[in-house]
Structure formats: structure tokens, C-alpha cells
Amino acid sequence: MKRKSWELKLIFLVLVAVFAIFLAVPAIRLLLKSFLGEDGLTGAYYLDVFSGKGFTTALGNSFAVSIVSALVAVGIAFVMAYIIHYTRLPRGFKRFVQAVATLPMFLPTITYGFAIIYSFGKQGLITRLLGHQFFDIYGFGGLLVGYVIYTVPVAFLLIHNTMGYVDKKTLVVSKAMGDGTLSTFWIAILRPLLGTLAGAFIQAFFLCFTDFGIPASVGGDYEVIATVLYNEMLGGVPDFNRGAVISVVMLLPSIVSILLLRFLERYNIRYDRISDADLRRNPGRDTAWGLSGTVLAILILCMFVVIFVVPLVERWPYQTGFTLEHFQEVFSDNELQTVYLNSLGMALATALFGTLAAYGAALITARSKLPGWCKQVIV
């Protein structure tokens, strides 16, 4: 027992050191950079940024598109999770819905931008098939579509996981008590999920607020705070002090998010025992939810079909003949092969060390008898 306690303490110290070196120290240096000028401490950089042309507009744009995107993403994620847990649809269909819901998380966000362009642009695949462009892809519309696809997997995993721990017999009890459909839906499904739904919204909002890949490809003239930061740090004349100010502003929502998530934990419902009840047969319910899941799955897949179609076309959209020339060019380019191998190596290393860190943190917070303050530090 003593050995186990010693091992957990060692894991705790290693995690604290890792978080301090790679998270706390850079954050502190960033904060100091935003206040330190040639003559010492100053707030001039903050005044300069907030009074500058376009910053407040970009900040407002970021909040607007992030809030709307997060709301839509949580709604879609809820529907797809509901189909899996609260319908009697075939198991194969449920697995298909789950696979589609998590598919976008395996692609980088800048890929979503290209997928939107090649799908919904004036010469996009879907636009050409339907003969009409439904929305302007450069600006709010493109950002909304990209952000929603980007954040649906995270919101889905949170809601899907929580639904698995909701006692299904609450549905039976609510019906036995004579509650109406809406009352049962609130009591047995929505009420136990309130904390998770709010948490999913916060996570989706923060991911949208800080993402750069999607605005870089389809942002257009609709400037958001991520593109402002890029222009300050990697523009013609980098300004690290102003960039630090913008970075601090971007970090503030994450701090608020953490505080809100801590607050929302008190609304989570904990069951002494979870029991699973067979859902009643309801063809109308299953048909409606099945159609909803099918439509959502098709819309998500349509976004990514073009990624597999365009590389096999001679010259999209003018020469649509089949060719493998593009693949041959890529695989024969030694520099691209080196870049690909470097990316693969970094991804494997990140996955390995990230998994170890997450597992160690889970051991400390859920399976150790260390003091409460130790667990709070990790969380």
C-alpha cells in the first residue's frame, strides 16, 4: 500500500512539473510580455490594441459566430446521441451514426475549409450537382459550417457518454405517473443532461473561438480574433507585445470556461444504481429520429466526399476525367514524403505522451487518496 502511495505521489510530481514547464511558465511569460515595455510595466499595449481599428469588431465577430456554431453543434450532437440511446433502430444504423458523428475529429481544421470550398463554392461538387450555390462560403456562413462540423464530435462524445449513465427506468416511472410527452422528455432526459449540455456548449464555443484553420481558408472579410493574432505575430512586421495582448484576450474565455464547468458540476445527477429498461415500440418515433439521423449523416459525409473525389480528377472542375497522376506526383516527391513522415512521427509521439499524461491525471483524480488540493491542481 505504501509503495502504491509513493508511486501515485511520483506521478503527481511529474504531472505538476510537466504542466508547470509547458503550460504555466509560457502563460506567465505571455502575460508579462503583454505588460512589459521598454520602460517597464505599462498598459499601453492593451490601450493600443483595444483602441485599434477592427479589433473590437473582430472580437464581436468571434463571439457571435462561436456562440451560434456551438448552439448548432450541441443540437446536432444531441440528436445523434439520442438516436443511439433512446430509439429501437437497428444496431448497425446506430453504429453508422456514431461513426459519422466522430469522423470529423480525425481531420485537421484547415481541411474543413478546403472541403467547404470544393463542396459549396461556385464550382463546388454539391453546387454543380444541385445547380445552385446555397450560401456565400466566405464569411459568416462558411465559418458557421466549418465550426459546426469541427465541434460536433466533441459535443457528441460528451453527450453520448453521459446518456449511457442516465437511468432509463426514469422514462417508465414518468409515464406511469401520467406525465405528458414533453414532461417526460424534460424529467427523464433533458434534466439529467443539463450539466453535460452546458459543458458541451462551453467546449464547442472555446474550440470555435480559438481556431485558426477554418478562418484562414473561408474567413474572407469576416475577421475574427484568431486572424488578428496571426496578422500581428506572422504579418509583415511582427509585434510580439500586441500579439501577447491578443493571446491573453483569447485565453480569458478558457479561464471563464473552467470556472463555469466547475460550477455546473453541481447540477450533474448521480445515480446509486443505473438500470436499463427496454424502450417501448414506437414506429413513428423511430422513423422520425431515423430520418433525422440519416439527413445529418448525409450532410456531414457530403462535406468530406469531395476530399476523395477531387484528387482523382484531372483538373477540377474543368477536366473531370479519372486520373492517378496527382497521387503519383505526391508519392514521388521526396520532400513531401519527409514532411509526411515527420508529421506521422510527431503525431505518434504526441498521442503516446498525451495518453500517458491523461491516464496519470485520471489516476490522481479518481483512484488516489491524495489530498483534495492535489486533485484540484491536476483538474
Model-derived features: positions:
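Cytoplasmic membrane-interface regions of multi-pass membrane proteins
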Residues: 86, 167-173, 266-276, 363
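Short, Lys/Arg-rich N-terminal segment immediately upstream of the first membrane anchor
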Residues: 1-7, 187-190, 279-285
